[in-house]
Amino acid sequence: MSKFIEPSSEDIKIEQLYKDMGLSDEEYAKVCDILGREPNFTEIGIFSVMWSEHCSYKHSKPFLTQFPTSGEHVLMGPGEGAGVVDIGDNQAVVFKVESHNHPSAVEPYQGAATGVGGIIRDIVSIGARPINLLNSLRFGELTEKQNRRLLRGVVAGIGGYGNCIGIPTTAGEIEFDDRYDGNPLVNAMCVGIIDHDMVQKGTAKGVGNSVIYVGLKTGRDGIHGATFASEELSEDSESKRPSVQIGDPFVGKKLMEATLEAITFDELVGIQDMGAAGLTSSSSEMAAKGGSGLHLRLEQVPTREQGISPYEMMLSETQERMLLVVEKGTEQKFLDLFDKHELDSAVIGEVTDTDRFVLTYEDEVFADIPVQPLSDEAPVYVLEGTSPEYNETKNDYSSVDVESVFDQLLQHPTIASKRYLYEQYDQQVGANTIVKPGLQASVVRVEGTDKAIASTIDGEARYVFNNPYEGGKIVVAEAYRNLISVGATPLAMTDCLNYGSPEKKEIYQQLADSTKGMAEACEVLSTPVVSGNVSLYNETRETSIFPTPVVGMVGLIDDISYLNHFNPSVGDTLYVVGDTNDDFGGSQIEKLLYGQVNHEFESIDLSQEVRKGESIKQAIREGVASHVQTVGKGGLLLTLARISAHYQLGLQAKLSVTNAQLFSETQGRYIVIVKNGQSLNCDYAVEIGKVTNDQQFKVTNEQSEIVRDVKHLNDLWEGAIPQCMTATD
């Protein structure tokens, strides 16, 4: 008789328990076909997480194949824990972005903290030392108490984990819109550095080689976390707090250092983080990639409490754990290393030649599954999509009250300074951060060299909602411009696709069209996709989030001396690069004045993006530019205001645009500040003004004049979010 009391195979079938785990009738039937029998409780649990949307990408896989994944600098693309890109001198940059949306909606502190911990382990599992963290966040409007609570918890969780483990958080972006009420997006990105010959893979091969577990003891936290992340949020989601993992950054730090030492051992065969789906995904994926079988003896798994069943062990998402495959006979060398770092570890199995994934507990078999079908035969769904109907009524911007709109947009949390939030993050630990949060890209020195890695993270929603294909191109181009703005050469990107339910025709079409646009932009801008993540079913009470693809991009600065002059001063000249048109679809002014965003906008010219980018990058490298800012949310006027407030400098500019166009969000534009006595050599550049010493922000056009004291401007910009967050609940 089994030591554990669990539903029988017959119970699972008759009571349709598989549906509670997220499997359909058809998927259950497919499992039965693969096994040649009805699955037991542990087996159906394993299939349910491996075939969940979060792990299998069953609705998005056809679209992901569009992305270019190879290129001049790519050493390792999708399929491993993170992408690896060459930066010269036998070094590479390793990076990836992941979502932790559903857990953060239920338990914001732990949801965000474990999102940070998980992405760090992805980078470490490749063998890289993390050098910085980034994040992309979305919340509902801060007028709502619930959204303020979520924001506080998420920011505290990000800072709490990153600060404790000793990795600086150097860049990010946050936007606010009521479409994210109760359904925040928390996307975390990590960047690391590695030597070429130290790159590791998550593979299990070599018959007889041993499987070693290391890290926190397994508990019952996070069981079915992958399944939870693959369903819509509902009023019952609060009851799923046990599906949210608990992070321990102090153990995370020990595990990181131990892992980075373990990768120097020649006897290491493969290594993988135990992330989504825990021991199930790490072990079965390693076996599949190695073309091997595995036998795990689950009584050897370190557990936090007695009585944890094989089902619970395999589906637990206890944090701070790694799985290694090491050469037979060298186990003690690794166990001694982990003992030195005060980590629990154990040999829990071995590689076999059976091509079967076998789990036993004290010789009782709890699972016997063919490896390849579990990993490779998850269902893939190609559905029918429908383009949404848009409101074709043309909004009138002919009588815009410039003064009122300017003050309101400057203080909207999406545009306002985020200093109140990012000051909770340690930005300098490691002492290699050159450009800190507040600008569009971070710059971190590659230790011991004159090189630096520039990194940025950028998401787009309203444009993607308005026109998914063009919006997909825009989000890639925005990240590209952010790297150009610090003089970096963009190398490659990672993506996180945040959408609602793909089973709804309009959302499925948004996913299809936006990924097509992203793929096209990647090709033209030479930024292949080397890693990524998909997060679907981001819906609450039948309301879907905006489709929100997020792009993390890295670039190389081959000589950090380029940035020595990067600080504007009085007498410098202002240029705008790129034309301004009537582009209000999806803009901040459209949302402010009309309460909705559903109008078309002009298409983006990707070939122009490349030409402008090369000219601006050259200006930075030649010491001509003292600051570069992409024109983003709120348009030209708000971009100039942010520069003035950020540097506490007066600006005087005259713009050849209408009042409404002051707030237009035409793509492909930059503000370039050029050193006094220099000029900008760029076909698309127009001189518009100067940096002044009178502490006045003054912008004029044919119709209006906006004048603000810089201190007052800064007080409004810096004070907006603190004022929202200290509102009486």
Curated annotation (Swiss-Prot):
Can you name a GO cellular component term? Answer: cytoplasm
| Gene3D superfamilies the UniProt entry points to | PurM-like C-terminal domain, PurM-like, N-terminal domain
CDD domains assigned: PurL_repeat1, PurL_repeat2
What's the EC number here? 6.3.5.3
User: Where would you find this protein in the cell?
Assistant: Cytoplasm
Q: Pfam families attached here?
A: AIRS, AIRS_C, FGAR-AT_linker
What reaction does this catalyse?
Answer: N(2)-formyl-N(1)-(5-phospho-beta-D-ribosyl)glycinamide + L-glutamine + ATP + H2O = 2-formamido-N(1)-(5-O-phospho-beta-D-ribosyl)acetamidine + L-glutamate + ADP + phosphate + H(+)
Active site residues according to the UniProt entry: 54, 100
Residue sites binding ATP per the record:
57, 96, 495, 532
HAMAP family assigned: PurL_2
Task: Please state which protein family the record places this protein in.
Answer: Belongs to the FGAMS family.
The name on file for this protein is: Phosphoribosylformylglycinamidine synthase subunit PurL
